[in-house]
Design a protein with these regions (language model features):
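Bacterial N-terminal signal peptides
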Residues: 1-10
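Central antiparallel beta-sheet cores of small beta-barrel/beta-sandwich binding domains
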Residues: 15-96, 100, 105-142
Length: 142
């Protein structure tokens, strides 16, 4: 009886809450961009932007040193609502990140500024909707 009560007590405290769906790195190969995130602990430090401290995450690009910083993230099920600002604080937007049934993620701008990156000295607008995937782990011994 005590074991049942103990197990129910732990279960009731949310022992098995999701802490991985919106944590880690996801990538978009077409635009060569990625998202680094931990919406559960809000403990991501943006490289080169340490002045912001720990944040829920950021959007980075392989060909641009600028970052779009996630200043707020609210997770509800398979979706996260985000408040994002550029690293100068001059542009911001609200977006939604959704885990799709096929395991991909969709970032959708809901309102506000269009995200942009620099490629070859020219500004490139990021589409209103963009699909991301988790990177494939490689075996270093292979």
């Amino acid at each position: 009886m005590a074991l049942v009560v103990s197990v129910l007590s732990v279960w009731g405290q949310g022992c098995c809450a999701d802490t991985v769906t919106f944590a880690g790195r996801i990538e978009n190969a077409e635009y060569q961009v990625w998202i680094e995130m931990d919406f559960y602990h809000n403990d991501v430090v943006t490289p080169g932007q340490e002045i912001f401290g720990q944040v829920p995450g950021y959007f980075g690009a392989k060909r641009d040193t600028r970052k779009w910083i996630f200043v707020d993230a609210e997770v509800k099920g398979k979706q996260a609502r985000l408040v994002i600002t550029n690293d100068y604080g001059s542009e911001d937007l609200e977006a939604r990140l959704t885990l799709e049934r096929d395991g991909t993620y969709t970032l959708e701008r809901l309102k506000g500024s269009t995200m942009k990156i620099v490629v070859g000295g020219k500004w490139v607008n990021i589409p209103k909707k963009l699909t991301f995937k988790r990177p494939v782990a490689t075996d270093p011994t292979a």
